[in-house]
A protein has these predicted regions:
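PDZ/PDZ-like domain segments forming the peptide/carboxylate-binding groove
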Residues: 15-20, 24-25, 77-127, 214-230
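Terminal peptide-recognition signature
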Residues: 13, 24-26, 30, 35, ...
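C-terminal, low-ordered peptide segments at domain boundaries
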Residues: 130-131, 156-229
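PDZ domains, with a preference for the canonical peptide-binding region formed by the helix
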Residues: 108-110, 121-158
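C-terminal cap/linker of serine protease catalytic domains
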Residues: 32-93, 139-156, 160-165, 177-181, ...
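Active-site region of chymotrypsin-like
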Residues: 1-44, 93-96, 101
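Extracytoplasmic/periplasmic, Sec-exported soluble proteins
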Residues: 18, 46-50, 111, 189
Length: 230
């Protein structure tokens, strides 16, 4: 099931996952190592499964009987592979880092990170110029450190700002938008008929229904109302 707005760590395997088998255990040497997730119809004998760390994070989340979700840092970044741009920013030669291009309003990073910051370290992991960190002997995106934590946890960051390194702490929050931006499944839409008109909540499912959403209306709602609330 895809929410349509985020992605998380998966493991690719050369064992095909047949339709209908999603949600079953993936085993190796008699031990469960993950949950079957999806196949790739464009490739032969390629499947993906949810790894144990993500499963453990989910189980810890629901211990209180409620699912709070995966926290989001709330930034958009760009790589700093271009050496000339790194020199322009004054970054030391032996420093990696990823450039903060946008901070999502009301997110975990709002009020902590600034546009133009270079994020160089997350917890004890060095971030390279492509935004990757070394995690369990693999190169993965630095967002993995946030995904492994719970909402309300703290995250230690190091950034390059105005020619010097500074250390920051942010408190992880859920994404600053509601369920209306996520795909929903097996749920009938709620609506009200009044005066011959049908009123329905504006959500992702409705927007992706052919012909239901005009570009001006989409812009008005998603940008003005959600990203720039009055």
């Amino acid at each position: 099931v895809h929410p349509g707005i985020d992605s998380h760590l998966l493991i690719q395997t050369d064992s095909a996952i047949n339709p209908g088998n999603s949600g079953g255990p993936v085993t190796q040497s008699g031990q469960a190592i993950g949950v079957a997730f999806q196949s790739n119809l464009r490739l032969n004998d390629v499947g993906y499964f949810i790894p144990v760390p993500l499963i453990n994070r989910f189980l810890a989340d629901i211990k209180d009987g409620r699912y709070d979700g995966v926290p989001e840092i709330g930034i958009e970044t760009s790589s700093l592979i271009n050496q000339h741009y790194r020199q322009y920013l004054g970054l030391p030669e032996d420093t990696g880092g990823i450039l903060v291009e946008r901070v999502v309003p009301h997110s975990s990073a709002d009020g902590v990170l600034l546009i133009g910051d270079v994020l160089t370290k997350i917890e004890d992991l060095q971030i390279d110029a492509a935004g990757m960190v070394r995690y369990s002997e693999q190169q993965v995106t630095f967002f993995i450190e946030a995904e492994n934590r719970q909402i309300g946890d703290s995250l230690q960051l190091q950034v390059w700002r105005k020619g010097k390194f500074i250390n920051l702490t942010l408190t992880l929050k859920a994404a600053p938008f509601g369920s209306e931006m996520r795909n929903s499944y097996d749920e009938l839409p709620e609506y009200v008929i009044f005066g011959g008109l049908v009123f329905i909540a504006l959500n992702r499912n409705y927007i992706h229904s052919p012909g239901n959403m005009t570009p001006p209306l989409a812009y008005e709602h998603w940008y003005r109302e959600i990203e720039r609330p009055r």
